Amino acid sequence: MQYIFHLVLFIFCVQISLAQEKSFGGLQDWQLQSLHSSSTRSISSLAGIWEISYDGKNWYKSTVPSAIKDAKKLYYRRTFDLTEEERQNNSWQLLFLGIEEEIEVSINQIYVRQYIGGMSPFYIQLPDKMLKSGKNLLEIVVSKPSQGFYKFKQQYEFSPSTYCGIPRDPVLIGTPSLWISGFKSTQSFSNNYTNAAINTNVSISSATLEKLGRLRSDSTKKTSAVFDKMSASVQIEVKHPDGQILTNVVSPQTIEILPERTLSIPISFQIPNPQLWSVESPNLYTITVKIIQNSITIDELTYPLGLRELKVGPDKKQLFMNGKPLFIKGLTYFEEYGLKTGITVSPNLLEQDVKNLKLLGANAIKLQGKAPNPYLIHLCDKYGILIFVDLDVFDMPSSIVSSSEMQIEMQNSIERYITAYERNPSIVAWGIGEGLEESASSTGKYTKDFSAFVKQRSSKLLYRTIRFGANAPNSDNSQLDFYIFRSTRQVSDNIDREIKEVKRIEKSFEGKPLIFLFGKLVQTNNKNGYSDPLSAEAQAKYLRDFYKLIKSGTYAGLVVWSYNDYSIRRPIFTTNSPDASKIATSGLVDVFRNTRLSYTMIQALFNEERDPLLRAGTYSESMPIGFVVLGLVATFAFLFMISRLRRFREYVVRALLRPYNFYADIRDQRILSLSQTVVLGIFISLTVGLILSAFLYFARTNNDVDFLFSLIIPWNEVKEFVDNLIWNSTISIISISIITMVLFYAFAVFLRLIAILFAKRVLFYDTFIIIVWSCLPLLFILPLAAVLVKIVTSTFSLMIITTLLVALFVWLFYRILRASAVVFDVDSFKIYAIGGGSIVLSLAVIMMYYSYEYGFVSFFYYVQTTSF
């Protein structure tokens, strides 16, 4: 009895778990109808339980849609049923609402083909000969591209996490043998928006001759022999937002089509006194396209139609919607929820987000990096939210922007976007790049060529997002409609500096509307008051100050980064949040939609209400005690040894003033104290630890330094360890000191190998002495290293001290080579050649590897030229 009870309990828990997983994805039938409305088609969501495998051998059950963070390759399979009538009378397609990676599709163990997802919706035609009545096995292999442009386009700062899987619903669609395969529309207005001219292009596709013959037989109620063409009429039915059908608007078009062909039919009509779509009144007409033969509707499909016009105003400073100025109040939005479900977001949650955006007073969202979810677009059409869609070109060096692979990738992406989204009224603009090198000629050429490519295919506006500090506009930007400027996103913001930059931008970039993108990271659960730059109050204050700055000028709008927190590909150290190092905490709400103080602030600002009071707090930054304590202890210990140990004092004097004699003694086997050498090495290592830790502590809130660290340290676990060290100065000093001591031993081993090359009887003990005592001059900056964290307070002081330290380390390297020549008793030129050549060769190999794998040289130069 107890066994049965536990079994029932287990089954119940599994069902609850599956139901909870299901709640994060999977469109209900009525939601699916809002995306693909037809009474003549079989439309079935394939969301539900699938089999999934990491290797194609070991399978387990899981839900679809779903995606797994950082997975490289996944195998999916499930079956679906077709009756004999369904198989014979319909043509079957798979509709994927969004897959980011490459996929391979097989039906009944027969390979169909490979497709590239890109997260935009796409159809896969299932060949008739591969289908059978009864159960059909659908197999999908999803894999991430690992080479080329895909690898580099994920490198940018705050790049969202990558997922592998099927994050949005797959849909099985059965169409008649003659079906509507595409619909495009453009619109224009006249007589002060009292008349709308609609130009449409309807695509009609046909199946095989056998299926067309069967369709003709059904429609005529007579058996038909083999024929060449099929005749039908195409009709368009327009429904007013109030539900009434507009009569005598569109005339039917007669077509004749051959088997396995696609026709494009242009159909134009006018709507008098249209009800316009706007953010305040999102009025939606519907267009139902029908294929009719012998008074029988063969196929029909319904599309939304929002009549609106968004263009640049006559003053070239504002955007006008339907003839009226529109100030953009937007937020960047990331389709992600929680830490487990990731980019698989339930339709109900998407709708709740859109409703919250309206309550905030927002009228636009900016989507970064991924093609929008069709259901999200449907909701924005319904509720009146404008969408700015960014292509996946972010913070990219000019050498990558100019590559042919990148150009082809972007052209393919925008064509898929236009096919999927061009007819939606909420989609108003395409972003063709963010954070590019404005001074590079390749950026101008890319903008000119790609803008022309898009303008030929789309009626949407075009823009680029430009980093603060960029040069004057390139002449090749003429086809852009407006600019978005992105603030620094630094934790330690300087609002006065950004005020000056906004004014400079206004003068330098005249002639186009300007929108400003700004935001600030916050430390989770930090409520210390805005005196702490990582606090929730500091985020709210920054957003308030920047908002009022933009509202005080004649600008086209603003976009806040961001509505919600989102997971990122690489850990960051700028927020000192070990529990959230891989989350961009820039949101007004966190990943679970819990609101922050900045949510209340933006709601008040967007709705022109009284903004909430902010608490300053008593936070003040102080120098970490670890620098002073460890620095002073090491300094006094070193001075104590010099004053009390005569032999040690003599070694120090001779190593500094008479290095040749000092190392000649080593060559002649005059033994130095090993214990004193080890202690000296500890002091020197501690000095290096103090210096490097001071630099890291100074740069702990700098995004550019964090980005370079992400390039240098490509392993997330190691990067997280280093990030934690940066904020814990004592552990950082000790860790770097230990690493330095280990390097002393490693270099000593290397010198021992060089000695073997020269056939010299030099022991490891001797090479260790060479390394340690050659670095002796470092100890004389030990007192400076103890207080260096207080001296390095600006980029200018950092550059001066860095230059001096580089010169010092070059001198130390020279001392090591000179000492090696003396101890090895060989010509100095040979040692210099081998030592210098080894360093150059090692650096060259490392740089070649990093450049090939991560584009390090290109990205390093990019950071240098775009930093503000």
Over which residues does each language-model region extend?
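Active-site-adjacent substrate/metal-binding segments within catalytic domains
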Residues: 66-68, 73-82, 90-95, 100-104, ...
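Accessory beta-strand-rich segments of carbohydrate-active enzymes
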Residues: 21-25, 36-37, 71, 76-181, ...
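Hydrophobic alpha-helical transmembrane segments and adjacent short intramembrane/lumenal linkers
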Residues: 722-738, 747-855
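Extracellular glycoside hydrolase catalytic/binding regions
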Residues: 445-553, 584-585
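Aromatic-rich peripheral "rim/lid" segments of glycoside hydrolase catalytic domains that contact
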Residues: 562-620, 625-630
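Accessory carbohydrate-binding/adhesion or oligomerization-edge regions at the termini
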Residues: 16-69, 141, 145, 241-243
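Selected alpha-helical membrane-embedding segments in polytopic membrane proteins
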Residues: 645, 649-759
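Extended acidic/polar, glycine-enriched regions
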Residues: 133-135, 224, 228-313
